[in-house]
Amino acid sequence: MAAVSPMHGTPCAAECAIRGRKHGRRLLAFAIVVISTCGTLHAASSAVRQSFDIQVPWVPQPASLGGRTELVYELQLANFSDDTLDLESVDALDGATGASLGHLDGKALDAAIGRVGSTPAKRSVAPGGHATIFLSLPAPAPGVVLAHRIEYAVAGTTQHFPVEGGRFTPRPANPVALGPPLRGGPWVAIYDASWERGHRRVLYAVDGRVHLPGRFAIDWIKVDANGAHASDNGSKPANWFGYGADVLAVADATVAATRDGVAEPSVVAPGPSRVPIGDATGNYVSLNLGDGRFVFFEHLKPGSVLVHPGQHVRRGDVIGKLGFTGQSTGPHLHMHVADANAPLAAEGLPYAMGGFRVDGTFPSIEVFGAGQAWTHHTASPRAPGMPGPLDVVTFTSR
């Protein structure tokens, strides 16, 4: 038998050597992949940043406001980074296509930002700080998923970054149908989403959660044809044109709660009445409309509440009289719909009011406050919904 050269080894040894070389190549390839992957992971990790938590605390449904169908809701931002972050822009996006459904920057963004406490630099959110963005945009088609992109800068640097979040699908439109809360007119629908201390912006955290009960609240104040709201300088509640007007049930409903006996100031002083938060409503009535919806009538005249809890009322029944109790700048009827029988611990809901026509509008709250004339339009019936901000209306049916 011929000798086998040690150099070549036995057939078994040769096979093992070949396997060893292949195994070595596989290990080398694996090592290259690992090194490459580590580089990729390192690059990706360097791009990850702490920034804003973006939440939509209440999922909206479309609302008819002044003949326009809109989504009215809020973004809650919390800064979880170690840096102060300066807000630059906010976009509401179609979550599927990325198309912008609404954009805010500059002065429009400034006007949409709400902060708790005194914060002169509204766009600058310190570490651990919070901001609320109050949004109103044309309602998208049913089923569209919304997302939001926040562009921000790191304070004191030239770094700018985007972050996306706050995805939701709007609820289907399902406003409760209501009748007029008052008779005749002209009555002014006092509300505007841009007012910094208006109902739309006042958040309450009274039960371990933050709520916005007045999201769609309206303060109704009666005026005359020339825009005045009182027969004198307005210093006496009884001289306001709407004072003592009958307040009407807006639907067939069950009385859910009442409060009466809150005293009324004898004079109307500049600025809102200073009262404890629990007394802000003054005398009030709430009606259970069913389906988890309640309507509130606030600031009623002392001794005027005519109903009691558990009582059934019909649309158009008199339930009280317009007054000047609680936190109020003057005699008016505050009305809103919410998802719980709690004046403050509930979420404000849209509604569809019928039985009114629009006679005109005030061009600004300053014009109204000065008692100047409102702009008269050709009177037009309005489809059920909510009147527009500062619309002047006449209620035409019970």
Which residues does each predicted region cover?
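Zn2+-dependent peptidoglycan hydrolase active-site motif and core
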Residues: 254-301
